[in-house]
Amino acid sequence: MIDLVFPDGSSRQYPDGATGRDVAAAISKSLEKKALLIKLDGQVLDLDRRLTPDLLTGERKFEILTREAPEALDTIRHDTAHVLAEAVQELFPGTQVTIGPNVEDGFYYDFARDEPFSLDDLEKIEKRMKEIVDRDEKITREVWDRNEAIAHFDGIGEQYKAQIIRDLPDTDTITVYRQGNWKDLCRGPHLPSTKHVGKAFKLTKLAGAYWRGDQNNAQLQRIYGTAWASEADLEAHLKRIEEAEKRDHRKLGKTMDLFHIQEEGKGMVFWHPKGWALYRVLEDYMRRRLDAAGYKEVKTPQILDRSLWEKSGHAEKFGHAMFMCESAEGEVLAVKPMNCPGHIQIFNVGQKSYRELPLRMAEFGACHRYEPSGAMHGIMRVRAFTQDDAHIFCREEQVTEESARFIELLRSVYNDLGMTLADTKFSTRPELRAGTDETWDKAEAALAAAAEAAGETLTLQPGEGAFYGPKLEFSLKDAIGRVWQCGTLQLDFVLPERLDAEYVSEDGSKKRPVMLHRAILGSFERFIGILLENFAGALPVWLAPTQVVVATITSDADDYAREVVEKLTKLGMRAELDLRNEKINYKIREHSLAKVPVIAVVGRKEAETGQLALRRLGGEGQSVLSLEEALRVLKSDATPPDVARALAVQEAVTA
């Protein structure tokens, strides 16, 4: 008999060789009908998988998964990819299938076919997919002999599947899933039949790809799709996509005249005056926050000798993404992909005492990394970017306090920028790692304690830490519910060893500092893209590249409008003057499309009475204020939140 432990802690016995379906049926007929998968000791398995001794080596924690389970959605998406592949091969004989994994919110499948797919083809494929769902084809798992599997796929012209099997370790079990008469190499798990996939799916786009991501290999055609547990979920997702397209930072960058990227500088941002104004406002804000938090700003070289990157380990780990060149004198130089080795060089100049720690070193460091052309995306994924990078050199006993301080700073920055901290992931020791278990125990405990002290709930990611230390990853949720991973806190006890960083301890001995790598924005370019999409371009007044446009109704108000702009500029505001001989409604529409937060309308009446008519972006109507009151209101709106807090404290002290 088999003992299984259920989520409520109860234990029940079942006959040897029972399947998940047998267990569900023994509980209730209704559960048997709803059951799609099982989970045994954290592993998701087919509903009809027999519970054999090789699966029952753990605690035997058992769960029956229905359509509502998050794990079921992953399988629905993967099964939809299989239905897609079957539909393609039915409609386009001779097409080879390669791989079809899940991605965020959906899936893709790569196909080898000489003639490219068209958007019309997607409609035909989607229709055939729904027919396959209606057929209710049974899905079964089969274990095959390796050589027989290779011979089978070679025999039907599926060279990519045969190659995948050849490349698998000899110890791997070869499993093929049969879906009606169609077969595919797959580890599983899968749903019991195609009807359980449902019809809450949609094919979304076509793209090119290379076999195994290598541009030297054959080019493939990729079909992307999304799939959900219900039609309502699909509809909500499609609405989010529609909204995301409206907010696309690439479109906003053009309409707001912020930046562009061109063929001669792939992945390199050309910042226009307004875009650079936004960049500098964000940079100045971050500089003030870091200054107030006790960081010292530094600047390190863009190009360093390859030998330093070899010593640090980056040449080995990141060499494929580094830009290198050889000088006329034979030096091999590398453009820096990150700032940490340079910061250790500064730390190593002069003897450091334990009294000087923690030492918080910050740099708005321009970095360059090679990204394949197909992977780049606007200013969110580029080859040249600037990190809000900092490294904290501290003693072991200071790690928890410094980490907690950083988390508080990060949370405050996100709040100021109108973003919500959604999730904090905690990545622990991987199998391949440097350092002793005792060192890792201390490091993981320190980060966990810091997160707890800062009130953060952690999502555990076992084994996902870097080889040199555990890390925290901080994700934001934007206005339409998308999650963006931005901030990081990485504990490193390897790089100080590699680059010989040390300090004199209290007892006079020399010790290695612990190094905390940390970033809040991640990169300025990507974070500006996130801000633009979060606010749909309608940035808060303090961040907006142009804060106010003073637009005239008539030329009689030109002199007054110039006076207003001069006063706004003296207050430190980014103000523009629009004296064009155009109708005021045309001017308002144009500046609204450019996402200017405030338009100050002036005509003969406002000029004569010394007033301003303020129109807010997205608001209805306008408010008419005296010039003095309008300047006060606009100055208040344009004051960065950290400056406003400092002024409030100053006023409270002097009151």
From Swiss-Prot:
The lineage of its organism: Bacteria, Pseudomonadati, Pseudomonadota, Alphaproteobacteria, Caulobacterales. Pfam families: HGTP_anticodon (PF03129), TGS (PF02824), tRNA-synt_2b (PF00587), tRNA_SAD (PF07973). This is Threonine--tRNA ligase. Its EC number is 6.1.1.3. Residues 1-66 form the TGS domain. Gene3D superfamilies: 3.10.20.30, 3.30.54.20, Anticodon-binding domain (3.40.50.800), Bira Bifunctional Protein, Domain 2 (3.30.930.10), Threonyl-trna Synthetase, Chain A, domain 2 (3.30.980.10). It catalyses: tRNA(Thr) + L-threonine + ATP = L-threonyl-tRNA(Thr) + AMP + diphosphate + H(+). GO terms for biological process: threonyl-tRNA aminoacylation. PROSITE patterns: AA_TRNA_LIGASE_II, TGS.
